[in-house]
C-alpha cells in the first residue's frame, strides 16, 4: 500500500466514507483517492512524493494557481487581527463594493459561508418576494445540497447514481420542477400551465456539474424573456462561473442579466465563502430590512473576505487576464482532440473562459445531461488513471468540469498534451 491508501483506510475509520465530499472518494473512476500535502502554482504534491499538473484547481477557486502570494499575504496580514468577531468589519463592505462594481446586476449582496447557503437563501428570497412556492431547475445542474435542490441534481449526485437523494421529502420535491437544460421550448410549455405559481428559475448559465455544458444560442435569453413575462425571479448560479468565465461572470459573457446571482469558490480565494445578491428591490426583503430571514455566525468572515478581495483585485488588474486564460484552454483542448484523433478515439470538447470539458463520444457536440450520460464512461476511467500515472490530475468523474489557471505555463500545457498522446496510444 502507498501512503495515500494508508491514509484513506485511516480516514474511513472516523470520517463517513473517508471523505468530506462524495466525489473525492473516486467512485466515478474507481481506485483510491490521492492525499495531497501542498500545492504551488499549477502543481499539487501528494503524500507519496508525486508531483501533478493540476486541472481540478480545488474545483474552480484556484484561478491564480495554488498559494498565490498576493492572496497568501492578504490572509497573513488579517490573521494577526483575529479570526472571527461575529460583528461587522470594513473588509466585508470592501468585498461587497468590489462585487457590485464587477457585476452590474448585483446592487446589494449578502455574505454566507458556502455556495449551498447562497443558493438556498436566494431561493427562499425569491419565494418570499413573489409569494409563490414552485421553482424550476434543470436536469444535471447542481445548486448545492439543500433539500429542494437535490432533485435530479448534478455533480457528485450524478457520480453516485442518486441524482434525487433519499431523505428529500416528497412534499419538498413536488415544488421542484426539473426540465431539460438547453430546451427553452420545454420551459415555455410548462410555464403555460403553472407560470403564475413559479417563484424562480435557477440555472447554471454554464452547466459545470454535468461536465462543461454551454448554453445554446437563445437559451439564457429565452429564460430572461419568460421570467419577465410571468413575473418570475431569474437566478444565475454563478458559484462556478463567477469570475471564472469572465470578470463579470457568465452573465457578462453571454450578455444576459439575472435578477439574483449566487457566487462562491473564487469569491473566497480558496477559503469557504458564498454570496448572493441582485436587485435592491428584492434584496431589501431580507432581514433586518424585510421579513425574509437569513443569518450565519461566520458570514462575512474577515479572513475569507480578505482572501476574496485580494483575488478579485489581482483578476481586475490585468485587462487581458481572461483572454490569456482562454488561449491556454484552447491550446490544451485542441491538443487533446488532435492526439485523440491520431489514435482514432472519438472525443469532443467544450470550452468557455477558464473551464473545459472532455467527452469520449463520436458525437460532434454535447449539449445536455442525456448526451453526457451517453459518453463512454469506461474509456474515461482508463484514461483518468493513465493520466494520473503521467502526473496529470483531472476531475475524477465524467460529470465534472476541469479548470486551468494563470499559473499553467506553455510547458505545462505541452507536457499535458504529450502525456495525453501516450495515454491515448494505450487506450487503442
From Swiss-Prot:
GO terms for biological process: protoporphyrinogen IX biosynthetic process. Keywords: Cytoplasm, Isomerase, Porphyrin biosynthesis, Pyridoxal phosphate. It is an enzyme of class 5 (isomerase). SUPFAM superfamilies: PLP-dependent transferases. It catalyses: (S)-4-amino-5-oxopentanoate = 5-aminolevulinate. InterPro entries: 4pyrrol_synth_GluAld_NH2Trfase, Aminotrans_3, Aminotrans_3_PPA_site, PyrdxlP-dep_Trfase, PyrdxlP-dep_Trfase_major, PyrdxlP-dep_Trfase_small. One of its GO terms (molecular function) is pyridoxal phosphate binding. It is found in: Cytoplasm. Its cofactor is pyridoxal 5'-phosphate. Pathway: Porphyrin-containing compound metabolism; protoporphyrin-IX biosynthesis; 5-aminolevulinate from L-glutamyl-tRNA(Glu): step 2/2. HAMAP family: HemL_aminotrans_3. Homodimer. This is Glutamate-1-semialdehyde 2,1-aminomutase. The lineage of its organism: Bacteria, Pseudomonadati, Pseudomonadota, Gammaproteobacteria, Candidatus Pseudothioglobaceae.
Amino acid at each position: 500500500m502507498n501512503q495515500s491508501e494508508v491514509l484513506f483506510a485511516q480516514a474511513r475509520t472516523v470520517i463517513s466514507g473517508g471523505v468530506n465530499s462524495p466525489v473525492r472518494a473516486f467512485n466515478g473512476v474507481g481506485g483510491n483517492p490521492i492525499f495531497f500535502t501542498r500545492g504551488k502554482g499549477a502543481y499539487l504534491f501528494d503524500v507519496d512524493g508525486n508531483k501533478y499538473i493540476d486541472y481540478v484547481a480545488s474545483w474552480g477557486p484556484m484561478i491564480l494557481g495554488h498559494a498565490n502570494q498576493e492572496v497568501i499575504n492578504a490572509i497573513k496580514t488579517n490573521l494577526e487581527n483575529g479570526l472571527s468577531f461575529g460583528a461587522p468589519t470594513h473588509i466585508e463592505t470592501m468585498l461587497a463594493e468590489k462585487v457590485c462594481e464587477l457585476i452590474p446586476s448585483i446592487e446589494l449582496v449578502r455574505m454566507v459561508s458556502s455556495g449551498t447557503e447562497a443558493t438556498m437563501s436566494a431561493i427562499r428570497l425569491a419565494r418570499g418576494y413573489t409569494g409563490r412556492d414552485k421553482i424550476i431547475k434543470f436536469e444535471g445542474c447542481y445548486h448545492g445540497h439543500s433539500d429542494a435542490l437535490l432533485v435530479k441534481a448534478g455533480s457528485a449526485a450524478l457520480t453516485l447514481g442518486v441524482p434525487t437523494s433519499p431523505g428529500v421529502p416528497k412534499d419538498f420535491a413536488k415544488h421542484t420542477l426539473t426540465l431539460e437544460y438547453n430546451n427553452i421550448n420545454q420551459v415555455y410549455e410548462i410555464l403555460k400551465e403553472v407560470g403564475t405559481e413559479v417563484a424562480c428559475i435557477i440555472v447554471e448559465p454554464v452547466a459545470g456539474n454535468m461536465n462543461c455544458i454551454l448554453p445554446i444560442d437563445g437559451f439564457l435569453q429565452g429564460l430572461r424573456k419568460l421570467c419577465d413575462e410571468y413575473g418570475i425571479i431569474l437566478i444565475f448560479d454563478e458559484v462556478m462561473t463567477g469570475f471564472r468565465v469572465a470578470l463579470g461572470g457568465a452573465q457578462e459573457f453571454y450578455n444576459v442579466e439575472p435578477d439574483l446571482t449566487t457566487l462562491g469558490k473564487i469569491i473566497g480565494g480558496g477559503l469557504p465563502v458564498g454570496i448572493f445578491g441582485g436587485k435592491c428591490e428584492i434584496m431589501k426583503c431580507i432581514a433586518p430590512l424585510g421579513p425574509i430571514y437569513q443569518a450565519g455566525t461566520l458570514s462575512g468572515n474577515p479572513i475569507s473576505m480578505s482572501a476574496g478581495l485580494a483575488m478579485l483585485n489581482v483578476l481586475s488588474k490585468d485587462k487581458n487576464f481572461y483572454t490569456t486564460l482562454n488561449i491556454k484552454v484552447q491550446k490544451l483542448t485542441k491538443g487533446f482532440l488532435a492526439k485523440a484523433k491520431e489514435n482514432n478515439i472519438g472525443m469532443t470538447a467544450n470550452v468557455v473562459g477558464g473551464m473545459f470539458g472532455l467527452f469520449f463520444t463520436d458525437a460532434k457536440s454535447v449539449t445536455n445531461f442525456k448526451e453526457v450520460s451517453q459518453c463512454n464512461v469506461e474509456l474515461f476511467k482508463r484514461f483518468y488513471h493513465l493520466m494520473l500515472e503521467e502526473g496529470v490530475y483531472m476531475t475524477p468523474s465524467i460529470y465534472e468540469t476541469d479548470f486551468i489557471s494563470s499559473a499553467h505555463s506553455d510547458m505545462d500545457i505541452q507536457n499535458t498534451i504529450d502525456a495525453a498522446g501516450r495515454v491515448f496510444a494505450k487506450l487503442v
